């Protein structure tokens, strides 16, 4: 009898684990669907304009004078993020600069407009159920984040003032094409050695897009996760051809897609070349990163894929070839 029970347990436990993982994927898809609906609803109410940080150098939008002094696009968006936190939480979020907020914090613009969440920060449902540490940050008071840094539960990135924003982190990134310029001398590009970061310069300008800027909305990704947390047996970087994950498309739909089925993408610094693509290294950069598939410290070379779509918002990620000229 004991042997039979042990056999049943050995059979049922893996199935139970798979069922729980499948349930977490359903929750993730529901969260992304909520994000896609909010993204589309915002555009409908804003006469076509997309939700993204919009402040520019020289703007005087904040009631706090220190948040009106930025001299570049990056810092203007930092000021806007700090302003949102102060207004929505009545907490004096310290000013910070030098961080590209458009990657993991753009949902705050939707929250500020009442399109997602319940009028409070942090917003529930913007962290993947499999993304362990941001879930911890969301439950941590901003002034206590440094204790998580010390215990290697939060990254030592940016200033202490910036790290107070981590409770508002989202697993789901808005692709650069939605908020960066198309002009090679004003756009951003991928850091070659750090998969997390973008390279930007003194001439970098961030822009605001419209919903009708998408030439192929059902084929263009807008929100993605840097990692496949649900489909592969082990968490893997999104750009590996074997990875797959739920993605939010510009038409508001959420679909699970395989990276190998996506187009290769482009190099935004060389947009006229049909052969140039964004190529960079994936390697372990922070405490919770999965190892590269090669198992080496050097890491693996990957393509940008739907993170760096050819022709930006005018391009195609899935279900068709890359246009040979800008649509």
Q: What does each model-found stretch correspond to?
A:
Residues 29, 34-327:
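Short, well-structured segments within or immediately adjacent to enzyme catalytic domains
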Residues 1-33:
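Amphipathic alpha-helical segments typified by the pilin-like N-terminal helix
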């Amino acid at each position: 009898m004991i042997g039979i029970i042990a056999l049943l347990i050995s059979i049922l436990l893996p199935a139970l684990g798979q069922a729980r993982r499948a349930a977490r994927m359903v929750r993730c898809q529901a969260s992304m669907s909520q994000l896609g609906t909010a993204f589309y609803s915002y555009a409908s109410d804003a006469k076509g304009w997309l939700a993204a940080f919009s402040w520019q150098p020289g703007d005087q939008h904040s009631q706090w004078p220190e948040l009106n002094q930025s001299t570049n696009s990056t810092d203007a968006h930092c000021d806007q993020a700090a302003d949102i936190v102060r207004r929505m939480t009545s907490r004096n979020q310290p000013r910070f600069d030098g961080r590209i907020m458009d990657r993991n914090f753009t949902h705050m613009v939707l929250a500020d407009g009442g399109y997602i969440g319940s009028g409070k920060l942090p917003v529930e449902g913007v962290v993947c159920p499999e993304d362990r540490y941001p879930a911890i940050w969301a439950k941590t008071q901003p002034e206590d984040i440094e204790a998580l840094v010390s215990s290697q539960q939060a990254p030592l990135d940016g200033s202490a003032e910036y790290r107070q924003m981590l409770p508002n982190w989202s697993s789901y990134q808005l692709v650069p094409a939605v908020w960066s310029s198309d002009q090679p001398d004003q756009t951003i590009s991928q850091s070659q050695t750090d998969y997390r970061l973008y390279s930007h310069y003194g001439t970098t300008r961030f822009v605001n897009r419209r919903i009708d800027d998408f030439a192929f909305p059902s084929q263009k990704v807008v929100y993605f996760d840097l990692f496949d947390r649900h489909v592969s047996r082990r968490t893997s970087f999104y750009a590996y051809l074997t990875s797959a994950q739920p993605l939010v498309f510009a038409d508001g739909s959420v679909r699970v897609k395989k990276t190998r089925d996506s187009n290769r993408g482009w190099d935004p610094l060389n947009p006229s070349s049909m052969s140039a693509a964004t190529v960079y290294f994936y390697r372990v950069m922070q405490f919770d990163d999965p190892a590269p598939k090669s198992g080496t410290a050097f890491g693996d070379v990957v393509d940008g894929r739907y993170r760096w779509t050819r022709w930006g918002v005018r391009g195609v990620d899935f279900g068709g070839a890359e246009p040979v000229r800008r649509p």
